[in-house]
Amino acid sequence: MLTWSSLSTKIAQRISQWSNDAFFALGWRQMRSVLAAPGQRILVYHGLDQRGETALNGRFLSAARFEEQVRFLSENAHIVALSDYFSGNFDQNQFAVAITFDDGQRNNRQYAVPVLDKYAAPATFFLTSAAGRDAEWLWMDFLDVATRLAPATIEIGGRRFTKKTWRHTRYFADENGRKLVDWARYSPWSFVQAMETALLNAGAWNKAEHWTTYWELLASAEIREMAANPRVTIGAHGHTHQDLAYLSPEEARLELKYCKDFLEKTTGQPVPALAYPFGTYTRQLVEMAAQMGFSQQLALDFLFPEDHTDHRLRERMCMNPFISDGNQWLAVKKGQY
């Protein structure tokens, strides 16, 4: 629920962003100087397309904007490999940035890899083992596209969900207003399967070919090809992209094991890096993952006090398609929006 406090915070943030844009436009602030001081940040991208579509979700940037951001970073910061970021193997007098991509969509290979090659920029791509189970999509991407194409109401497991729109169109449960994406995230896998079946039966996927950029995943051969590129490192992102923090320890262990085994077999390389789906985890998960060989673990925000001194764990910042690049670099510098 949007409270007055959160609304006033958003208004103040928007005014600050407008002011920053004006300062950059008038030349009162130079964008190239924003990252001039020493610092470090891990950036998270997801999907790239031709136009920077934000109608489905907030996870896509245009390929042109991504290239401009990599160009800026290559000229005004130090882009480092994730392994070097973890080990501190970079010039501490510069602003160090590690680039990461989550989810393993095919558009990463089409749009991101050529840019990385052009600017000699390393990046880590965190993939699920969807290709190993012959899955055509990740459930969140399926839901985003299907919601756009599906009827106004849908019934799943005896619950009725109705579409509502603010920035994005979403399904909400009639009984309590909870978003369908949250039902899927926090429910057993059987609910996700029931959701997909209900949306498919409702004809939600009949025109999905027009939206392939937003759900198609990398095939095993494409993963193998990317892994052979010296700019690319492959990391793990779970088996089915479930929220590991809400699974039993054994279910979470299998999610990690299936993913790690598949990626290592496919690439012929060790996979020591793990990005937690949704950025959530528990301390038990951190220990379990470390025992499985994940020495580089990535959250979004730290969740526990001891995380700050845990050399196996780092925070990341998701890139925001709704703000200007000037405001994006200011946020990267501060580590928050």
What are these model-derived regions, one by one?
Residues 115-118, 291-292:
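Glycine-rich, phosphate-binding/catalytic loops in enzymes
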Residues 103-110, 115:
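Short acidic, Gly/Ser-rich segments with clustered Asp/Glu that frequently serve as metal-coordination loops
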Residues 48-49, 119-280, 311-314:
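Metal-dependent polysaccharide deacetylase catalytic core of the NodB/CE4 family, i.e.
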